[in-house]
């Protein structure tokens, strides 16, 4: 689209091989990959009285499984920030097939949060500590008028950068 540009930043992470297995008895370690529109959220991390991605996911897990583990994210996004592949991990004791958990969470979560993948992973996996790389994408729309359909997803800037 004319006037748009994309800046992609790739940050390699340090290797961490420590075992971060949860100590919940008879629990399986889960990994979810999420996509979300963060416009209406106060970031990733639970904040009292504020809607957050982590809080919505924890509440949805409670409604689906009767368990409320605190999902650990591969990073914490700020208020209004979107994600196309945020990874989270948590322990669950409920015996549920991955496809069923994915489907149930997507029916329960707000439309602005979607689970793209649900997998049972080794106990040593931890979304934050096992990450090896992160990619950040900044979209700048360089024109005098930004189309409303893009306004939530770009920085509108008509001045030289």
Residue positions per predicted region:
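Structured-RNA-binding interfaces characteristic of tRNA pseudouridine synthases
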Residues: 5-161
